[in-house]
Each structure stands twice: as C-alpha cells, then as structure tokens.
C-alpha cells in the first residue's frame, strides 16, 4: 500500500504544481488550478478471518478557472481511478474523481 505522501507527490507531478491540498482547513487560501483530496474509505479483503489487503479510496476534486483541465485525463490514466461528476461554483469548475491508491 502506497503512502499518502507518495500520493501527494504523484498529484503534484501530474498537476505540475504544488497546489495540491489534503483536507485543507477553511483558513487556507487555495491557488488554482488545484487538487483538493481527502480519504473517503478503506476497502479490506479478508480470508480465513484475517485481513490481508487494504486499499484506500480518496475523493479528488480538481478546481480550475477553465473547464476541462488537462490534469483530469492524466488522473484518469492512473489505475483504479474513476470520474464521478462535474459542477461549477463561484465561477470555478470542479471535477470530482475517485482514486484507490
């Protein structure tokens, strides 16, 4: 299982920016384009009453001033990623994805 810090580095690499935020407090002023992400669940595989595989699911929100930011397609190229929805709020485009990492 990869660490959250490894995920942070991978997201920064794909975004080509350090504007990647894990569960940011409301006091943080985000810079765009940005990726905001948080842990959503941990899937567990069991056999013989023993947990043997854990996979963490993260909800990622790509926030951009323009529609269709290229990083979305880069994220979808990662294994175990899926596109959930898109919406606009405060003149910013939001693309929401799920990633198991």
Describe the function of each predicted region:
Residues 1-44, 50:
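Small/polar-rich, solvent-exposed N-terminal microdomains that initiate assembly or binding
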Residues 13, 65, 77-81:
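Short, intrinsically disordered, mixed-charge
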Residues 30, 51-55, 90-92:
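Short coil/turn motifs at beta-sheet boundaries
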Residues 44-45, 66:
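Short, cysteine-centered beta-strand-loop-beta hairpins and adjacent loop/turn segments enriched
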Residues 54-65, 93-101:
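Oligomerization/assembly interface segments of phage tail-like spikes and tubes
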Residues 67-74:
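Short, conserved charged micro-motifs
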Residues 74-101:
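Acidic-leaning, charged glycine-interspersed low-complexity segments
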